[in-house]
Amino acid sequence: MRAIDLKMQELNKKFKADIIQQGTDIIEVDKIPFSSPMANYMTYGGVPVGKITEFFGGEGGGKTTSALDICANAQIKFEEAYDKKVAQLQNEIGLLEVKDTKEAKKKIPKLQQQLKEIEEKGPKLVLYVDTEQTLDTQWAQLLGVDTDKMILVRPQEQTAEQVLQIILELISTGNVGLCVLDSIPCLVPQQIFEESMEKKAYGGISQPLRIFCSKILPHLTVNQCAFIGINQIREDLSSMYSTISTPGGKGWKHACSLRIRFRKDTLLDMNNKELSSRAENPAGNRVGMEIVKTKVCKVLIMSKSYRQYTQVIHLSPEYFHFYIVLLFLDIY
């Protein structure tokens, strides 16, 4: 055996994990889908599990609505995965009981213990951190979110460091399959929390968020948890051109595997016909999505989904346009 092989075994034994290995397996990144077919097409299936995703954009762009849509689909996905696993174990136990051999009798207690642990743990949960204090539970329910099964964190006088530590500890339990932080700019670091309004602070949320990203990424991978951070946009006053920036610093941007910009697009009436920007009572609007950064799929062109204020996400016209896009790509 080579010296490197012995050293690899020694280090893996020392750290009690197979963190060093020769060769790599192709790891399929699981996704939590949007309800929008165009959004799923752009992101190759939705929000990646085990990664950090950022939704950012101006007010009314559809960031929170899209995040809640992901929450609803995540709950369905987690329930289905739980039911499938339980049914699989029950089926295995049943087959072994029918065999009635010594080897089967040895395996049954282990499988029963495994089944008991899974049933006690239950399906994975959605964690929603409402730092803005603006979550409308009725709107969330209209989007399909089961708010009774969702863990809601509403910080009162906690600093950014304390809120981020709460998130870290909850995800490390392994029971959380999706975490939504709404939103990053509302986190107040300890340094700013203790100072008066007149005193100017530098750095802001960047430093605690950078440390948080370094700590949370391994937990997201091990516990198979997706993380969505909702962010706002700011005008960059230091530039002579009309440019925008987002709070959180460069460390946050580097940690994100997927960054999606949301824009409020054309206003619509009840028949999904376009209205002027000055219309007083629109029934909904198109939501523009742009993939700004991705490590999990190819960057595609911008897409638009349909949102009605009474029927939430209106899919009928979107399916039609999605078919047209696929037909166009097939021709060319």
What does each model-found stretch correspond to?
Residues 118, 157-222:
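Phosphate-binding/switch loop-helix module in NTP-utilizing enzymes
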Residues 149-157:
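A glycine-rich helix N-cap at a beta->alpha junction
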Residues 1-149, 168, 172:
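The Walker A/P-loop phosphate-binding site
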